[in-house]
UniProtKB/Swiss-Prot annotation:
The gene is rplD. Belongs to the universal ribosomal protein uL4 family. One of its GO terms (biological process) is translation. GO terms for cellular component: ribonucleoprotein complex; ribosome. One of the primary rRNA binding proteins, this protein initially binds near the 5'-end of the 23S rRNA. It is important during the early stages of 50S assembly. It makes multiple contacts with different domains of the 23S rRNA in the assembled 50S subunit and ribosome. Part of the 50S ribosomal subunit. Pfam families: Ribosomal_L4. The keyword RNA-binding applies. Disulfide bonds: none annotated. GO terms for molecular function: rRNA binding; structural constituent of ribosome. Residues 50-77 are annotated as: Disordered. The keyword Flavoprotein does not apply. Residues 63-72 have a biased composition (Basic residues). This is Large ribosomal subunit protein uL4.
């Protein structure tokens, strides 16, 4: 694995960083990564999908019309499922817990494997200290940086040490950029990003997290 280059605001590179040895995975570990993705996606489900049954629909306390001599089929309630606005038969109810379980070691391995593959594919760039602050909370300056770095058409993941208000404001209107703290980066975040730009301080702490 080659050393990681440190990018400047003008798009040039100055300095290098050597990744830790435990990130030198030669082959991706597929199964833990797959399980971690399922875990993360299941955790996003709110479980609020619900329909009303015949007993829960309002109205229909009496027969809509008399039993006989109407020329129509007999009906007992407008809450019956075949009526428009009636109850739903076998509809979804939020009585299921969608959360999955995965051992901590397996999830850690999935994170390490996903990040290591990005390193092996030269898809990780280290940002110099306070690079993102140079945008001054301006989207235009962030676009200038992306243009200088030739990253305007890519889905990007910015990994930071601490929450930076100028960075959030400068990327808020750029849908191709996801900003995450080093301790909140998920396997899905790593895999979806075409290029990862990570602060120096965040890179050191992320290495510790992935040990």
């Amino acid at each position: 694995m080659a050393k990681l280059k440190v990018i400047q605001f003008d798009g040039s590179f100055k300095g290098e960083i050597q990744p830790a040895n435990h990130l030198l995975l030669k082959k991706a570990v597929i199964q833990p990564v797959f399980d971690a993705i399922l875990l993360e996606q299941a955790a996003c489900r709110q479980g609020t999908h619900s329909t009303l049954t015949k007993g829960e629909v309002s109205g229909g306390g009496k027969k809509p019309y008399k039993q006989k001599h109407t020329g129509k089929a007999r009906q007992g309630s407008i809450r019956n499922p075949h009526y428009v606005g009636g109850g739903v038969v076998f509809g979804p109810k939020p009585n299921r817990n969608y959360k999955l379980k995965l051992n901590k070691k397996a999830y850690q391995l999935a994170l390490t494997s996903a990040f290591a593959q990005k390193l092996n594919n030269n898809q990780v760039i280290v940002a110099e200290a306070k690079l993102f602050e140079q945008t001054n909370a301006k989207t235009k300056k962030m676009l200038t940086f992306l243009k200088n770095a030739k990253l305007t058409e890519q889905k990007l993941l910015f990994v930071i040490d601490t929450i930076s208000k100028p960075l959030l404001l400068s990327t808020n209107n750029l849908k191709q950029i996801v900003v995450k703290q080093f301790n909140k980066v998920s396997v899905r975040d790593l895999l979806l990003a075409k290029t990862i730009i990570i602060e120096k301080a965040a890179f050191t702490k992320l290495e510790e997290r992935l040990k």
